[in-house]
C-alpha cells in the first residue's frame, strides 16, 4: 500500500502596516535612502485621529511657544517627536495634545550630535524653537542661538529632512545693541548656509497667557512705579499673538511656496511703549506711575538682577531689547501670506492680564478699559 501523504498547513503571520509599506516601497521604488513611513501618507477626514502626513521634530517644545505649536500639530493628526532636557513631570501637559501614540518624547543633549541625529532621522519636518532670555553658566547666547541651531540644521540636512523651520526675532540684526538679537542674526546666517531651503520665522514680541512680555510689565505693580527709558515715547512695539505665530509655523510646514523664505510675524497695530504699558495697567485696574530712567542706569540695574542664581527679574540684555523699536517689515511676507489673520492685542490681552487684577475687578468686562493708542510709524 502506498504511504499516506500528509499535507501540513502553514499559517502565514499577518504583516504589520509599516512592513507592508516598506515592502511596497522596495518593490516599486527600489532601494532608497529613507524608507517611506506610513505616517507621511495623509489619510482621514482631518483632526487628531487622522494622519496629516507631517512627522515633525519640535526642538524647544517645552517652552512658551512650543506648547502651542505641538498642540496645533497634534490637532491635525501629525506625529510629533519632542526632544526634552527637563524633568519628565515638566512635559506631562504635552501628552494630551495628540492622539494615542502620536507624541514621542526623547531625551537629548544639545551638545551631542548623535542625539540630535536620532531626534530628526525619522522626520520630514524639523522646527527649532529653542530660545532663552538670559545666559547661564552652561549655555550663553552664542550656544543657544548660533551653535545649537547650526547643529540641528546640519543633522536635518544630512538626514534628508524636507522642511526645516527656524524661529528668530523681528529685530535680529548684526548691529543691534542687544547681544541676544545679534546672536540671533548670526544664527539665521549659519542656518541658511547649512540648510539653504530653511524657512526662517521672525516674530515680534509674542504675547499670550505664559508670556514674558505683558506679564513682565504687569508685574511692575510690585514696585509701585514703572521705569521706562525716555518714558517709552521713543520705542514702538508691534506685539503678535502666540496662537497666530503657532498657526503660521504649522501652515509653513504645508505651504509649497514657503520654502527658502524669511517671514516677519507681527500684530496688526503698532504702539508707543508708554501707551502700551499704560493700557496694561488700565486692564489690570492698577495705578500707572511711570518715571524716566536713563538707559545706562537701567542697564546697570538689569546687570545686577542678572547676577541672581535663580530666574532673574530682568537683565541688561532684556532692558536693551524691550527699548528697541520693532522694524516695519515692508519687504518680507507675513502671517497673511500663510493664511493667518493677525489678532489685535485688545481682543486677547484680558486672557493674560486678568490674573493681575484685584479680587473686586476680576469679573469686570473688557470694554471698560480704553484701547491703547496706536501709531503709524
Curated annotation (Swiss-Prot):
InterPro entries per record: ComplexI_NDUFA9_subunit, NAD(P)-bd_dom_sf, NmrA-like
Predominant cellular place of this UniProt entry's protein: mitochondrion
A single BP term in Gene Ontology: circadian rhythm
Transit peptide: 1-35
Subcellular location field: Mitochondrion matrix
Post-translational modification: Acetylated on lysine residues. BLOC1S1 is required for acetylation. Acetylated by CLOCK in a circadian manner.
Cofactor: FAD
A GO CC annotation given for this chain: respiratory chain complex I
Modified residues (N6-acetyllysine): 189, 370
Cofactor: binding comment: Binds 1 FAD per subunit.
Pfam families linked to this entry: NmrA
Alphabetically ordered keywords of this record: Acetylation, Electron transport, FAD, Flavoprotein, Mitochondrion, Respiratory chain, Transit peptide, Transport
Modified residues (N6-succinyllysine): 175
GO MF terms, alphabetically ordered: NADH dehydrogenase activity; protein-containing complex binding
Family, per entry: Belongs to the complex I NDUFA9 subunit family.
Subunit structure and binding partners: Complex I is composed of 45 different subunits. This a component of the hydrophobic protein fraction. Interacts with BLOC1S1. Interacts with SLC2A4. Interacts with CLOCK. Interacts with RAB5IF.
Function as written in the Swiss-Prot or TrEMBL entry: Accessory subunit of the mitochondrial membrane respiratory chain NADH dehydrogenase (Complex I), that is believed not to be involved in catalysis. Complex I functions in the transfer of electrons from NADH to the respiratory chain. The immediate electron acceptor for the enzyme is believed to be ubiquinone.
Protein's name according to its UniProt entry: NADH dehydrogenase [ubiquinone] 1 alpha subcomplex subunit 9, mitochondrial
Originating species: Mus musculus (Mouse)
Gene this protein is translated from: Ndufa9
